[in-house]
């Protein structure tokens, strides 16, 4: 058995984190040392003080995340738990523990993912079908390294973050084409040396059969990687009481005009497809590229306000599409022409007031947004008013979007500049 691993010592965290070696604490817990949490660098007592303080927290407290995050880096810890669970590692959490903190972590504890050789097949204690979510839920809360997760799952913010972050990683870093390419490269680098390995340490008279077994192990592991995510998604739904998985697609129009940030990731190419979970709120935000502005979301039956740059709600669907429409920035001066829309804004740039002209002589509703989609002002345009005066003296100098909702012809979008000083 050969293992290739990083040596996570003070020098490692100094090089990779820029941590001061005199400010680093490293703790380890291993069955080889009696299963006792021992100090490799520094002392172990501060960890137990942090764990005790965490144990006194109330998961129903709205400030639970912030209080817990002072002791344990929760975003880091969540990724650590997800890694252990996706790999289906059960030689843990009483074994194979490495924890550190430093001046760089704000003296918050971070866990390191190590020793996964007994996870999944061909030689692990579990396989692709193993329900690791259930395994974690059944753990003893007196074990510090899982107790943070067990208590965290009683808090809505932590629980929602864990579920959405797990979905994010399965839609990105844990995609089969990504993770299998890493394993394939390591296999290719090792394969050429295995003939000499078996010749010296194996059976030199039966090298072809040993090479066949070596390749077979590689193919089995690849198959495990390919099938794992589907099983994990099923386990998340069944164990955490979620209604269903949601097949989600993201798209931007026109191409290259922006991106869409979903939960904790921002895909680079569109259309983009992923799987999320009904039952937890998901944040989806349109992000315009330089030279563009967010215009609106395509109607998908879930978005209540298609002009708001951010959607934050549950994905109550089985299949859903989010398409963000962007416009190109061409904000000029003078009057914004009404054209066939029948509405116009002037002057542009504007000072303390701007005038909304109603050439249609129809009643309508206007809403004013900043370029991040935040609603700033709204009002009614009366049928008899050919001109509506809108006070914008409280707005900071910037570009703004006016939406006029015509009940018969639909929305009209106008943009204007609030000038810094027109005097």
Give residue spans per PLM region.
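Middle-to-C-terminal accessory/interaction subdomains
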Residues: 1, 13, 45-249
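Conserved ATP-binding subdomain of kinase catalytic cores across diverse folds
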Residues: 1-42
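Extracellular modular ligand-binding repeats in secreted and cell-surface proteins
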Residues: 263-291, 316
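C-terminal outer-membrane/trafficking sorting elements
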Residues: 336-346, 350-423
